[in-house]
Amino acid sequence: MTGDHIKVIYFNGRGRAESIRMTLVAAGVNYEDERISFQDWPKIKPTIPGGRLPAVKITDNHGHVKWMLESLAIARYMAKKHHMMGETDEEYYNVEKLIGQVEDLEHEYHKTLMKPEEEKQKITKEILNGKVPVLLDIICESLKASTGKLAVGDKVTLADLVLIAVIDHVTDLDKEFLTGKYPEIHKHRENLLASSPRLAKYLSDRAATPF
């Protein structure tokens, strides 16, 4: 992928594109971050294969274009390309296991999206008092089982990145929800940012967005 121009296309938010962006950042890969407004989306949609975002457009040195679709498939591809899916079969399994656990948590967050405010507040209360704590406990157990300081060992993997992306969604729902609880999750973020100065800078510089 050396010399290729990589463009990540999504709306002006973290959402499903953030794990892709963070994977590229952590790997030290330059990319163009194209953010589309909801107003412009109807006219841009026909130009995107499948008409869905996020999408990644890769243009090689000869002008040949390759489109990549489906957020987790893209993130996994980029992570594998840059040796961020574990170094052994056991580590690969643990990366995928944690990704699955995090996706369960993301599913709960998605229940709150595109809802009227009153309904959103009701759903938020239900999930924060229901499945979310259970899923966070499961994730904490996986973090405790790690053989290193990060999600799987001591090297940054996709599991680390999808985890902090979704934890940010939990705090979007309630900024105080994690305060004083889930020490493994707080320690994981601290260790991750210490392990990847590029990622730490990216997160420090990242503009606030509603999702």
Curated annotation (Swiss-Prot):
It is an enzyme of class 2 (transferase). One of its GO terms (molecular function) is glutathione transferase activity. Pfam families: GST_C, GST_N. CDD domains: GST_C_Sigma_like (cd03192), GST_N_Sigma_like (cd03039). Residues 88-211 form the GST C-terminal domain. One of its GO terms (biological process) is glutathione metabolic process. Residues 4-86 form the GST N-terminal domain. It catalyses: RX + glutathione = an S-substituted glutathione + a halide anion + H(+). Its EC number is 2.5.1.18. Signal peptide: none annotated. Keywords: Transferase. InterPro entries: Glutathione-S-Trfase_C-like, Glutathione-S-Trfase_C_sf, Glutathione_S-Trfase_N, GST_C, GST_superfamily, Thioredoxin-like_sf. Gene3D superfamilies: 1.20.1050.10, Glutaredoxin. It comes from the Eukaryota. Glutathione binds at residues 10, 16, 41, 45, 53, 70-71, 104. Belongs to the GST superfamily. Mu family. PANTHER family: GLUTATHIONE S-TRANSFERASE. Conjugation of reduced glutathione to a wide number of exogenous and endogenous hydrophobic electrophiles. Homodimer. This is Glutathione S-transferase class-mu 28 kDa isozyme.
